[in-house]
C-alpha cells in the first residue's frame, strides 16, 4: 500500500504543472510567427477574434473537464468519442489528431533548425532537425513528473518574454522610454477597425483558434494528475484565463506600434514592432525565446502523442505491438518520435507535397475539438452531471451546441485563408481514409470471428484414441488370466 502511494505521489502532476504544460504546448511557433497572418486578415478586429476563440476554448475545456472528472482515462477525447459516438469515431479522431500533430511538430523541428543555423550555418537542417526530435523524444522517456518540471521551465521563459513585450510596449505607448516620444494610439488610430469585414474575422478565426491549440494536453494527462477530480478543473481555469489574458493584452499593445500591413509571416510581430522603434537587440533575444517556445511545444506534444498511441492500442485501434502497460508509454513515445523523423526527412525530400500535408494540421485540431463537443452533448444527455454533481458547463445544452456549430463554421471558413483550401481538402481526405481503414479492419475482424465461431460449433470427427484402446485390451487380457487361474 505504501509503495503504491509513493508511486502515485511520484508521478502525480499538479494543477500548476498541467497549466504550464498546456501553455508550453499552446504558445509555440503558431503564436510567435503565425499571429502575423491572423492580424493581417482581421486588422484591429483581431481583438474580437481572440475573445471569440477564447470563449470557444473555455467551452471546449470545460466540456473535456466534465467528461474527464466523470471518468479519468488514458487517451481522453478519443476514448470519450469511442464511448459516446461509436468506436469508428474514436478511431478516426485519435489517428487524425495524432497524424496532424506529428506533421505539425516535424515542421516545428524544421523551424528550430532554421533559427539555430544562424549560429551554426555549416550544419545541415536534416542533422539539426533530426537531433532535436531525438533529444525531445528521449527526454519524454524520463516520465511525467520530470517532463512536467522541464515544460514548466520552458513555458516560464516564453511567458516572461510575452510579459516583457507587453510591458515594453506600454512604456513606448505611454512615452516613458527615454528619447522616444509617446506613441499613444499610434497606428491603431489610422487603421480601419475591420479592414476585411466579417470575411476578415472569419478568415482569421482558424489561425486564432490554432494559436490556442494544444490545451487538450490537459485531458491526455488526466490519468497522471494528482487527484484528477480537483486538479483538472483547477488547471483548466488557470489555462483559460492565462491564455485569453495574454493574447488580448499582446494584441492590444501591438496594434499601436506597427501597421498591420507591415507584418510578415516570416518575422515575429514582436520583433518587427520593437525593431521599428529602435529596440533592435530584441530580435536576437526573441529568437532564443522562439526556440524555447517551439521546444516546449514539442515536449508537450510528444508527451500527449505517446499516451494517445497507448490509448488507441488499448482500444484495439493500433497494432498490438504498441501496447504498453507501464506508467511511461515508451513504445508510443518512440513510435511518435520516429514518425516525426520520417515527416522531417519527407519534407526535405518532397517539400511541395509536405506543405500540402502540413495544412491539414489546423483541420485535424478543429475537427478534434468539434468531436469533443459532440461527445460532451451525448455524455450529458445520457449520464447527466458527472459523479458528485460536478457540472461546470454553463448554459448546457445551448452553449455546447453553439461551440459545436462555431467550430464547424471555422472549418468551412478555411478557404478564406490563403493556402488553407488545401488544408480543408487534405484534412477531409484523411477523415475519409481513416474511416475506410476502420471499416476494412472491422470487416476483417467480423470475418475472422465468424470463421472461428464456425470451427467451434462444427461437429467433431471421431478419432480413435489408441492409447485408451490399448489400455482396455490389456485390462481384458489380465481379467482372462485371472479367470484361468
Residue ranges of each PLM-predicted region?
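Membrane-interface "cap" regions at the ends of multi-pass membrane proteins
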Residues: 1-34, 40-45, 58-62, 74, ...
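Helix-loop-helix junctions that connect adjacent transmembrane segments
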Residues: 5-9, 46-47, 121-124, 153-284, ...
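Extracellular loop-to-transmembrane helix junctions
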Residues: 10, 23, 33-128, 239-242, ...
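Membrane-helix boundary/coupling elements in multi-pass transport proteins
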Residues: 32, 73, 96-110, 212, ...
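TM-loop-TM module centered on a large, flexible mid-protein loop between adjacent transmembrane helices
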Residues: 79-82, 86, 118, 191, ...
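Membrane-interface loop-to-helix entry segments
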Residues: 113, 126-183, 236-237, 358-371, ...
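C-terminal membrane-solvent junction of multi-pass transporters and transport-like membrane proteins
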Residues: 150, 322-330, 366-422
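A generic transmembrane alpha-helix motif of multi-pass inner-membrane proteins
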Residues: 359-365, 393-485
Amino acid at each position: 500500500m505504501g509503495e503504491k502511494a509513493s508511486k502515485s505521489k511520484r508521478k502525480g502532476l499538479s494543477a500548476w504543472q498541467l497549466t504550464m504544460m498546456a501553455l508550453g504546448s499552446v504558445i509555440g511557433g503558431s503564436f510567435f510567427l503565425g499571429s502575423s497572418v491572423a492580424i493581417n486578415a482581421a486588422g484591429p478586429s483581431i481583438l474580437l477574434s481572440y475573445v471569440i476563440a477564447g470563449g470557444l476554448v473555455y467551452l471546449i475545456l470545460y466540456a473535456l473537464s466534465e467528461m474527464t472528472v466523470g471518468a479519468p482515462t488514458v487517451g481522453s477525447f478519443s476514448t470519450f468519442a469511442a464511448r459516446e459516438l461509436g468506436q469508428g469515431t474514436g478511431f478516426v479522431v485519435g489517428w487524425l489528431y495524432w497524424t496532424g500533430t506529428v506533421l505539425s511538430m516535424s515542421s516545428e523541428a524544421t523551424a528550430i533548425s532554421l533559427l539555430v543555423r544562424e549560429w551554426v550555418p555549416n550544419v545541415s537542417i536534416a542533422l539539426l532537425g533530426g537531433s532535436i526530435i531525438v533529444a525531445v523524444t528521449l527526454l519524454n522517456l524520463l516520465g511525467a513528473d520530470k517532463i512536467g518540471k522541464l515544460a514548466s521551465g520552458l513555458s516560464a521563459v516564453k511567458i516572461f518574454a510575452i510579459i516583457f513585450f507587453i510591458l515594453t510596449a506600454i512604456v513606448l505607448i505611454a512615452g516613458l522610454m527615454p528619447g522616444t516620444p509617446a506613441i499613444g494610439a499610434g497606428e491603431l488610430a489610422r487603421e480601419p477597425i475591420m479592414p476585411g469585414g466579417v470575411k476578415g474575422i472569419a478568415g482569421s478565426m482558424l489561425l486564432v483558434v490554432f494559436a490556442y491549440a494544444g490545451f487538450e494536453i490537459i485531458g491526455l494527462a488526466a490519468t497522471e494528475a494528482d487527484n484528477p477530480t480537483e486538479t483538472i478543473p483547477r488547471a483548466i481555469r488557470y489555462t483559460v484565463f492565462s491564455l485569453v489574458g495574454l493574447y488580448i493584452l499582446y494584441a492590444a499593445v501591438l496594434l499601436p506600434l506597427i501597421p498591420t500591413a507591415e507584418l510578415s509571416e516570416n518575422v515575429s510581430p514582436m520583433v518587427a514592432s520593437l525593431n521599428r522603434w529602435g529596440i533592435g537587440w530584441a530580435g536576437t533575444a526573441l529568437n532564443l525565446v522562439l526556440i524555447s517556445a517551439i521546444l516546449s511545444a514539442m515536449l508537450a506534444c510528444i508527451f500527449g502523442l505517446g499516451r494517445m498511441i497507448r490509448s488507441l492500442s488499448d482500444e484495439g485501434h493500433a497494432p498490438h505491438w504498441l501496447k504498453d502497460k507501464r506508467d511511461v508509454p515508451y513504445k508510443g513515445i518512440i513510435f511518435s518520435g520516429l514518425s516525426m523523423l520520417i515527416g522531417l526527412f519527407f519534407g526535405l525530400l518532397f517539400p511541395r507535397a509536405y506543405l500540402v500535408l502540413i495544412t491539414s494540421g489546423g483541420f485535424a485540431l478543429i475537427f478534434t475539438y468539434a468531436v469533443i463537443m459532440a461527445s460532451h452533448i451525448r455524455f450529458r444527455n445520457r449520464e447527466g452531471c458527472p459523479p458528485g454533481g460536478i457540472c461546470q458547463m454553463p448554459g448546457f445544452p445551448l452553449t455546447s451546441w453553439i461551440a459545436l456549430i462555431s467550430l464547424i463554421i471555422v472549418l468551412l471558413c478555411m478557404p478564406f485563408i490563403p493556402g488553407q483550401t488545401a488544408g480543408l481538402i487534405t484534412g477531409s481526405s484523411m477523415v475519409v481514409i481513416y474511416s475506410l481503414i476502420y471499416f476494412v479492419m472491422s470487416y476483417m475482424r467480423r470475418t475472422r470471428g465468424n470463421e472461428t465461431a464456425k470451427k467451434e460449433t462444427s461437429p467433431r470427427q471421431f478419432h480413435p484414441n489408441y492409447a485408451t484402446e490399448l489400455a482396455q485390451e490389456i485390462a481384458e487380457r489380465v481379467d482372462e488370466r485371472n479367470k484361468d487361474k
